[in-house]
Amino acid sequence: MYMDLTLGGALLQVEEATEEEEEEEEEEQALGQEPAPAAAAAALVLGRRHGVVVGGGGGGVVVAAEREHMFDKVVTPSDVGKLNRLVVPKQHAERFFPAAAAGTQLCFEDRAGTPWRFRYSYWGSSQSYVMTKGWSRFVRAARLSAGDTVSFSRAADGRYFIDYRHCHRHGGRDISFASAATAMPAAAWPLFGRVQTAAPVSYGGGHGSAAAATMFLDTVAPVAAAGGHRGEVGPSGQRSFRLFGVNVECGGDVDAAAEEEDADDDVDDGDHRRGEEMELVMWTNHR
């Protein structure tokens, strides 16, 4: 039951927002208001901020009053969406604005002195204070997006003022591997190749001004055959083989030692055979 009531209230709010947006478009076409010139708007803003007398557009005189900053609101996607409403924080609404009775309207002046009227209501379903009718027109005029800040202030005579500022949005930044390569140490020890310096390579739209070090690794041919490491005999008769990119040579002393070991093995084998023959003769005589 509670979910059905909540859904019904949400649908009703969407319908009201659509109707109010259509009414605002009709009012805009009927009024045909145009923004004030930039110079006049700037002069009017300075006059209102500093309390000086500024000439009006029709020859009148506007006396600016001191303002009291009330609060700021960072608008959310729903505040600038199609719901046509701005949620006012409860503590600020109850402190600065009058009671949200049926048909209550709040009038604000922007930085150019243009009046803006918003319907001010209290939604019991969500227990929130909102500005509805007129808000979407202000969003379009100020080109508000999620993350922008809306500022509210008031004067001693009871007038309300509204202002805004856009947040700084950073465009998408392409990743440049050239800038990342610049941060690499210049003298790295190559294990299986050599290090060369090349022009910076940029993947995307990065702007790399400094030269970047790019590493090229030379591939090394296999140094081991099926039975082990491949050995080579140099012109001096010394044996050599390649291990991890390094030529390892075996000196003549190693070969001589190997030959001596082979000779010792041959002598031991001959002594062993003669001993076996003598044992066989002695065993035959004993029989």
UniProtKB/Swiss-Prot annotation:
Compartment(s) where it occurs, according to its Swiss-Prot or TrEMBL record: Nucleus
DNA-binding region boundaries: 71-168
Name of the protein this chain belongs to: Putative B3 domain-containing protein Os08g0157700
PANTHER family: B3 DOMAIN-CONTAINING PROTEIN OS08G0157700-RELATED (PTHR31140:SF14), B3 DOMAIN-CONTAINING TRANSCRIPTION FACTOR ABI3 (PTHR31140)
Protein species of origin: Oryza sativa subsp. japonica
UniProt feature, compositional bias: Acidic residues: 17-29
Example GO molecular function: DNA binding
Entry GO terms, CC: nucleus
Pfam family, one: B3
Annotated stretches, region: Disordered: 17-36
Record bears the keyword NADP: no
InterPro entries xref list: B3_DNA-bd (IPR003340), DNA-bd_pseudobarrel_sf (IPR015300), LEC2-like (IPR044800)
Keyword Magnesium: no
Key words of the record: DNA-binding, Nucleus, Transcription, Transcription regulation
